[in-house]
Amino acid sequence: VSGGQGSEAAAGAAGQGAAGDKISSVLFLCGMNAIRSPMAEALARTMLPATVYIASAGVRQGRRDPFVDAVLAERGLTLGERQPQRYEDLEDGYFDLIVTMAPEAHHVALDAAGTSSVEVEFWPMPDPSVVTGSREQILDAYRDVLKRIETRISGRFGR
């Protein structure tokens, strides 16, 4: 299990795990599966091959965030009818790679990974829901996080 910011270098070629094996499933995990991890899931579905299974979850139950829908719609993306889900409620709990976006999610993923061969990477992302101001200022914070996630996915998977 890898768990630091240096884990990207250890991952080797884009789309491969540390051992060089192809990654076939990715879970994006954050606090409530309301903002960062659903954004990552929506982006990854367009940036990674269709053969890669992509999911997202939170360590706690969250509510769908309308600002996420707004910034995704600006990019022509949608979550459809998808609602936030908890990590412990996932039907298939095995993933080749778990990308965590909040410290609490990282600790949960490391504990869950235990001695298994799953890779865990921490991609710290700011929480745009703490930003105050006008609607446009708040949307800018969400856009910034979306762009950061897109950059990380592109860098990690070479897309």
Model regions: which residues?
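Structural signal for conserved beta-strand scaffold positions within catalytic alpha/beta enzyme cores
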Residues: 56, 81, 100, 121-124
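Structured loop/turn residues at beta-strand edges in well-structured enzyme cores
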Residues: 21, 93, 118
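Conserved small-residue
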Residues: 33, 72, 98-99, 149
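Mid-chain, well-packed structural core segment of small domains
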Residues: 93-112
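Conserved active-site segments centered on acidic
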Residues: 4, 12-88
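Phosphate-binding/catalytic loops
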Residues: 108-159
